[in-house]
């Protein structure tokens, strides 16, 4: 039944788009995987998880490809025909109408989208880590009022280790502490 369906598109033009999705994730790939097939359908707006689901496409893909799990361009067309057949069974429309609707959406799509990739934003991290008001104890001395680090002077207490005895610290502090 699916084999009788015809494709109303320019094969060479769609083949270029098919190649782009085939190479998505593997630049040297020559056959499309089920994952890339689902991405192609999802980016085109065909795979909506209501009328056409990933399960439907997975079953159709494995019917055509069998154990090899990858499809050539002609095999991909057969998979599309199976998907259109499943969709037509649900919608009670002719298979050719469903296939035309699917192929029209796929033909409009240029290349895989890479939307949703997270971009690192470190501005919040730096402002949080250099906000001296959030630190307590000796750590709050590491930054000045603008949040700029003081360097070694903020990390270490500098004392003068000079005097008449080797371990004597804080030279000239006796008179200050004993009131003389």
From Swiss-Prot:
Function: Regulator of microtubule dynamics.
One MF annotation (Gene Ontology) recorded for this entry: tubulin binding
Similarity comment: family membership: Belongs to the TPPP family.
InterPro entries: EF-hand-dom_pair (IPR011992), TPP/p25 (IPR008907)
Matching Gene3D superfamilies: EF-hand (1.10.238.10)
Spans annotated as Disordered: 136-180
Basic and acidic residues bias (residue ranges): 136-158, 169-180
Biological process per Gene Ontology, one example term: microtubule bundle formation
Pfam family, one: p25-alpha
Protein name: Tubulin polymerization-promoting protein homolog
